[in-house]
Amino acid sequence: MTKKYRHLLFDLDGTLTDPMEGITRSVQHALRHFGIEVSDLRELCPFIGPPFAESFRTFYGFDDRQTSEAVSREYFTEKGIFENRLYDGMDELLDTLTSSGYTLCVATSKPRVFAERILDHFGIAPYFSFVGGTGLDGSLPTKADGIAHGLAG
């Protein structure tokens, strides 16, 4: 029997890893800078998934300047990025899939450089032949843009 699919595309947050602690603490830290206190981190779970900039605009009505300032807060890049955990059994799943001949890829709305750091941190980067994400410079602003860029070569 021939495999119907050879390439498998995974999201990062919520699929490979549970990013709740790092993302919500990062958002809490950024909001505190603006005098907004959120003590229950579960209130910030809607930030998991979409790009931070989009979420700050949607949930807090931030303008472009505030959004830029909020997403550039140092907490995530220094600490929050690693306040994250690999889902149980993920190593074994990825090993089984690659051993079975599948090509694995990651697509995320997170900046690609951060996604690569997370994959390296958990020791699972070697399983993936492609990591698509947004650019820190605003290029490839959506997950779909990152995927299209990767497919284009």
Task: Name what the model sees in each region.
Residues 30-31, 50-63, 118-121, 150-151:
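Helix-loop "lid/cap" segments that line or gate small-molecule binding pockets
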Residues 26, 40-43, 51-56, 114, ...:
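Hydrophobic alpha-helical segments typical of transmembrane helices
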Residues 46-78, 88-98:
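A metal-dependent, Asp-based hydrolase signature
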Residues 1-46, 61-62:
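Active-site neighborhood of HAD-like aspartate-dependent phosphohydrolases
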Residues 32-38, 99-100, 123-127:
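Short helix-capping segments at alpha-helix termini
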Residues 24, 49, 53, 91, ...:
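Alpha-helix N-cap/helix-start and coil->helix boundary motif
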Residues 4, 79-106, 112-116, 141-144, ...:
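Short, acidic loop-to-helix structural element flanking the phosphoryl-transfer center
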Residues 125-140:
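A short, structured active-site edge motif that brings together acidic residues
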